[in-house]
Amino acid sequence: MSVKLGPAGVPLSCKGRTIVEGMDDIISLGLETMEVQTVRMVAPQHFEQYWQAGVLAYKADFEMNIHGPYYSELLGDRLQRNRSLAKIEAALQAAKTINARHVTLHAGHYGDMSRGQAANEQVASVFKGIVQRIRDIWNDDEEIYPVFPWLKDGTPAKIGVETSGRQELWGSLEEVLEVVNHVEGTIPVLNLAHIHARGHGRLRTSEDYGELFDQVRETIGTKQFYCHFSGVEHRMGNAMHYTQIKKSDLNFEPLAEFIIEEGSWLDMTLISDSPLLEHDAMYMVQNIERARHRQLERKAREDRRKALAAQANITPEEMEAREIQVAEARAKDALANVQPAPVESEEAVEGETAEPEKKEEAVEEKTVESDKKPAKKATKKEEDNDDLFAVEEDDDDIF
């Protein structure tokens, strides 16, 4: 099993914004791949840093990948298709310069065509031309081998056909698999967030992921997978936007469990499309490690059970049944040892609550009585002195 993880673009934590600086940060995090984004355009000034990144990837055995333009119209009219192919040509040249192993592309809207065989044949025809073009670029000129040493082995980048996230876009899982099955040199790019959204939240358990990868393996007979993963907000079978993994109903834990428990045959590159990029890539690494630890703990328990069963001359299944019985007995004993608090009758409770109320009423009555006690009768001398300063209310009218 081989699983390489990395972000889609330069890490957010990278102080510099060049690809080489991003690669340094990714390698320092222990990640093994990245996907360079050329989603809108490839400018000539970019090729210098692309070449530097390609040299670093070649020396460090680091897997580089590239994402072509998002807005392709491969099913549009001839003008739209030629514009899209011009952008794809720039992405292919960048892939050669950067030593990319995969080039991810979209087909775009259906245009005037509808879903079905005709649209799939049109897409397949275009991708056959793209595959031939990447081969020509890779084997263009032997004189440039000293500058691009990774071209010597003669293995061009794979052309990836990505699953789309919306119903109006070509790229359902079945459409992608049909095209890839008929075009040599292409691979399916399983955008798991898109597949989850188009399936109305279909990827929820490790069994769901198992069915997905088995479907791909049985259809095109591959063990190599190139996947994107991210959280996603979706409605009515359409992906709205990417989210961080923890804020989505698309959980990574079931995929990690599938990779460890049943994915020993996988050769997978897994790209984090999350807005958190390398942070969620590290989150995926941690979940895979946790799944691996759980597997080791389970195997250790099974080995111990087999050893005890052999000593007791019984089967491991019988030993497991005994362990369950012992655990249940211990749970019952623990419940029995817990002394429940005595339950008092309602009348006693009412009596207890009434007594404090009576005490409070008695205290209130005492305070009222004390307030009502007449003050000490003043002496005649004190009354006369008080009269000296007594002022009737009517005197205020004088002023």
List where the protein language model places each region.
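N-terminal pre-domain/capping segments
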Residues: 1-93, 187, 294-340, 345, ...
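Hydrophobic faces of well-ordered beta-strands that scaffold small-molecule active sites
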Residues: 3-9, 34-36, 64-68, 103-105, ...
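Active-site beta-loop-alpha junctions enriched in small/polar residues
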Residues: 8-12, 37-41, 69-71, 108-110, ...
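Gly/Pro-rich active-site loop or hairpin
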Residues: 16, 114-117, 170-173, 196-267
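Acidic (Asp/Glu)-rich catalytic clusters
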Residues: 23-28, 45-65, 93-97, 132-135, ...
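Active-site acidic/histidine proton-transfer and metal-coordination neighborhood
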Residues: 59, 74-189
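Flexible, acidic glycine-rich loops studded with aromatic residues
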Residues: 264-268, 273-278, 293, 302-305
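C-terminal helical cap(s) of enzyme catalytic domains, especially alpha/beta-barrels
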Residues: 278-291
